[in-house]
Amino acid sequence: MTTAPQPKQSIFSPELVRGAVRASFAKLSPRDQARNPVMFVVYLGTALTAYLTVANLVTGKPWGYELAITLLLLLTVLFANFAEGMAEARGKAQAASLRSAREDVKARRLVNGQEELVAGTALERGDLVVVEAGEMIPADGEIVEGLASVDESAITGESAPVIREAGTDHSGVTGGTKVLSDRIVIQITSGAGESFLDRMIALVEGASRQKTPNEIALSILLSGLTLIFLLAVVTLYPFTVYAGAPASAVTLIALLVCLIPTTIGGLLPAIGIAGMDRALQANVIAKSGKAVEVAGDVDVLLLDKTGTITIGNRMATKFHPLPGVTEAELAKAALLSSLADPTPEGKSIVALARQLGVDAPEPAGAEFIEFTAQTRMSGVDFPGTSIRKGAGSRISALAQERGGQLPPELAAITDEVSRQGATPLTVIENDRLLGVVALSDIIKPGIRERFEQLRRMGLRTVMITGDNPLTAEAIAKEAGVDGFLAEATPEDKMEMIKQEQASGKLVAMMGDGTNDAPALAQADVGLAMNSGTQAAKEAGNMVDLDSDPTKLLEVVEIGKGLLITRGALTTFSIANDVAKYFAILPALFVTAYPQLGVLNVMGLHSPTSAVLSAVIFNALIIPVLIPLALRGVPYQPMSAGALLNRNLLVYGGGGILVPFIAIKLIDLLIGGLMS
């Protein structure tokens, strides 16, 4: 992973804290508070205790206790606002850095073959723009002519330039990046304010962040618990009246605030925002919080072999001619079919042929046939000759269509190359099969261990490749994936995704080409490469700025971290209520029912100190947990059952133990001050 586009700041850096403090007070409006039902109850309780404090002050009654509770409840609300403000401030800092990458540059627009200088903001979809070395790319687009080295560090943080080329899956360019060499013609794909950078800034700022389905479900649960505790507290008041020691309204409000799940209620918005923030720290732009959340629930990962499982630099390593064909004949035919092939594989075939002393000029009247995922072959036609190279099954079918024979040795050569983990490309000239070109790749170091981790997480990995089944099987075994789809076409990918989804599975995949767009849109998590085509980036619900195919594995871990953090803090928050129950409930009834003093297991000094201690802890635990909410609970690959048991022990047990200790310490401090 590369460095993020902005300098990483510590969680509590002065700039972020100042912004979060301002946001804490700005969010005190009823409209903002009403978005969070749990904290809205605390907000209303604060207003009511403030009213009772003023009423006591005016009528000459004691008001110190009421004022203390009011200030503590206000702090609880402010701390919850501060948590959300911290998460938002981090996003705004990142957005400011991204915005600095956007410059209003001049563009050289092509009109009827003539260049005219216009403002970058005046460009519209479909315009053709010329960009040369040293110039900024004015807007998002697709290269339609040429090849260039592009500096994308303003977007990705990666200082190494990348190659962008017309007619490939790496033809997409982003406004705000800089051309370092050569000349390209770009067709603009976004209007003013609609560029990828503009959308990134809007997403990072989170101005229109929507709650995710799990977040909504949890909010409903927390609201239900709040309603139950509200009814319970209201019911307690008649009991205290009947006992002859009516509880004050302020104490009942304090009890309610301590019992409702204010900890998770105050941290929930921050956890959701922080999930998208952690994705951005990994240089992944998530188009919604839902995309990050769903990544944590994914069951099946569809992974492209090239670039994800292997290094992705397949090179021609050997020519295997059939009987009756010389190596030079095979090399020449393969070279001719690859002269216009822009792929690394095609260029390596030309290089290998020339190493063997075989060379040939481009034939007169040559028409080059590009490779497509549907045909799975490429080649060249010129007068009297038609040469194709491609997948063995497709070339064999072509040979039969042309009336040629299938030499029995072909299958043996193909199988041997495949068993070695190389990709066999079969070459045919007219109706005569010439032999096989072996393309070799290398399994990425450590990838097998990574897949083992995913298996322990309960995920199934499927390798997608255009290779024949034997090659696919050899690589799948070496890499340790759970399954593979060989000789895959875009339609095959789509069909597999639909089948998995029909069986109730959530599917994640990555892609970079226009032909990947339908599958990216169909997948529950579609990670598009920033270097890919505009269609792929539009179809996916995440974009990887580093264009690293292995990033899909990291995205899944980020999603799981988000879900685990939310679950762990919810468990901790609800477990807190047990300790606060033992602190406040005896304080309510001990005067009327002295025998209830046995419930005062913490040995708190007095009813007043008990209530104050619980409310102080209830307020302070929110800022204490902010770093955990923003960083996330560390995720370790393990089964769902083991993960649940660990979280119940750590966060459930800790949620009971920590308040017992903290409330007792606060009570000792209050008792010392009061004495």
Swiss-Prot record:
GO cellular component: plasma membrane; potassium ion-transporting ATPase complex; potassium:proton antiporter complex
Residues that span the membrane, as ranges: 38-58, 67-87, 216-236, 253-273, 582-602, 610-630, 654-674
Gene Ontology BP annotations: potassium ion transmembrane transport
InterPro entries the record matches: ATPase_P-typ_cyto_dom_N, ATPase_P-typ_P_site, ATPase_P-typ_TM_dom_sf, ATPase_P-typ_transduc_dom_A_sf, HAD-like_sf, HAD_sf, P-type_ATPase_bsu_IA, P_typ_ATPase
Subcellular location: Cell membrane
Positions contributing to ATP binding: 341, 345, 371-378, 389
Binding site for Mg(2+): 512, 516
Annotated signal sequence range: none
The keyword Cell membrane is annotated on this UniProt entry: yes
Entry keywords, A to Z: ATP-binding, Cell membrane, Ion transport, Magnesium, Membrane, Metal-binding, Nucleotide-binding, Phosphoprotein, Plasmid, Potassium, Potassium transport, Translocase, Transmembrane, Transmembrane helix, Transport
UniProt-listed Enzyme Commission number(s): 7.2.2.6
Catalytic reactions of this protein: K(+)(out) + ATP + H2O = K(+)(in) + ADP + phosphate + H(+)
Membrane topology: Multi-pass membrane protein
Active site residues according to the UniProt entry: 304 (4-aspartylphosphate intermediate)
Similarity comment: family membership: Belongs to the cation transport ATPase (P-type) (TC 3.A.3) family. Type IA subfamily.
Task of the protein: Part of the high-affinity ATP-driven potassium transport (or Kdp) system, which catalyzes the hydrolysis of ATP coupled with the electrogenic transport of potassium into the cytoplasm. This subunit is responsible for energy coupling to the transport system and for the release of the potassium ions to the cytoplasm.
The protein's assembly and partners: The system is composed of three essential subunits: KdpA, KdpB and KdpC.
NCBIfam families per record: ATPase_P-type (TIGR01494), kdpB (TIGR01497)
Protein's name according to its UniProt entry: Potassium-transporting ATPase ATP-binding subunit
UniProt organism field: Deinococcus radiodurans (strain ATCC 13939 / DSM 20539 / JCM 16871 / CCUG 27074 / LMG 4051 / NBRC 15346 / NCIMB 9279 / VKM B-1422 / R1)
